[in-house]
Amino acid sequence: MSRIAEHLVRIGPRFLPFADAASDQLPLRKLLRLSLFQVAVGMAIVLLVGTLNRVMIVELKVPASVVGIMISLPLLFAPFRALIGFKSDTHVSALGWRRVPWIYRGTLALWGGFAIMPFALIVLGGQGYAEGQPFWLGVSSAALAFLMVGGGVHTIQTVGLALATDLAPREDQPKVVGLMYVVLLISMIFASIGFGWLLDPYYDAQLIKVISGVAVAVFFLNMIALWKMEPRNRAFTVKPEKEPEFGDHWREFISRENALHGLIVIGLGTLGFGMADVILEPYGGEVLSMTVAETTRLTATFAGGGLVGFWLASWVLGRGFDPLRMAFLGAAAGLPGFFAIMGATEMTNVWVFLLGTLVVGFGGGLFSHGTLTATMRLAPKEQVGLALGAWGAVQATAAGVAIAGAGVLRDILQAMPDLSGYGPGAPYVAVFALEAGFLFLTMIVILPLLRSALAARRL
């Protein structure tokens, strides 16, 4: 381990956020090495949602509706996250592993998707050497690449978090999962800055180098994270007499009090925070005339706000604060952020736009940690992996709907002649206003849960 890492380990829980997630069973240095799988996932998310979103729309001139659909394709696997987690719970392996084989499969899918993606995007854009190539070829190859990346990301993250909870003591599992998401946000910040620097100025050959480099980095990061991490167990080599049924476990989980209501809250809140993902960077480039590097840093700004929100939520929740109330406050914090983003259109002020983006990210961090903690507390010990999968499935599915819907809605509004007189920012403002509406609806839906929780504490 490097001197810097050793110094961080010695700092201790008092100053290092989430250091109290470590234990004798899972030391901090081992926990940080395991979290490298989230670094790989963060790089992939930034590349898809941030960098390639801007490059496809502005540089490659791909319609925003096509971009929105492409970016949402990886999220087709989102509804299966609970099933993926359940399958890794019950996997039978000759080597005595349950998690490692699934993470390895996800890594290969992610690597393969990135291997063909840059060439597919260049053909999709139809410029330069790809001019005159059939449109269907670019669409089909790009769709395949995005699907492979999506399958890899969801598999790696779901099973990786399950492995982290396996290794951590029961009482430390929410802290460990919180640390994993903080690492994800930090990696997104640095990845967005790095990709912006590498792609400024943009040219096709550099795009190929960057995406291919990410493919190689993802493979090695996951191999380092998994090295001697999961202990081998002879019991995992024996096939049970009766195969466990996913449907039975799912019905048991969803029948718990407020489980379905809580998943609805997660979906609505994610719609509120998620639609901005696909239009923040095009909005900055088209309306506020920001460069590729400047708009790519928007992802870092958004993730930075989320990092602060996630850390604050973890600190407060660790002192007994109600996670549902935390989710309510997160949705409430997102409203002024979207108002600032919408106001930046009239003021043509980049700093107001950045401030609004930061506040929206902060609210998203509070909301995500609140709903994640509430979901984990809802599940018994033997269903924590299923609970994580359910949270991830609803969150990622809603994010996919939000991303696709925002791109299509932006294109429809942009094509309406009645809005042409309001300037190029009008379609974006309409989408941001819709997001604010979803957050307000989320707050309304959370209120009955808060009242029932308050009544239960009074008994």
From Swiss-Prot:
Superkingdom assignment: Bacteria
Cellular compartment(s): Cell membrane
SUPFAM superfamilies associated with the record: MFS general substrate transporter
GO cellular component, one term: light-harvesting complex
InterPro entries: MFS_trans_sf, PucC, PucC-rel
Pfam families per UniProt: PUCC (PF03209)
Segments forming a coiled coil: none
Keywords associated with the record: Antenna complex, Cell membrane, Membrane, Transmembrane, Transmembrane helix
Membrane topology: Multi-pass membrane protein
Main location per the UniProt record: membrane
Transmembrane segments: 31-51, 66-86, 106-126, 136-156, 179-199, 207-227, 260-280, 298-318, 327-347, 350-370, 384-404, 429-449
Family: Belongs to the PucC family.
Function of the protein: PucC is required for high-level transcription of the puc operon.
Entry protein name: Protein PucC
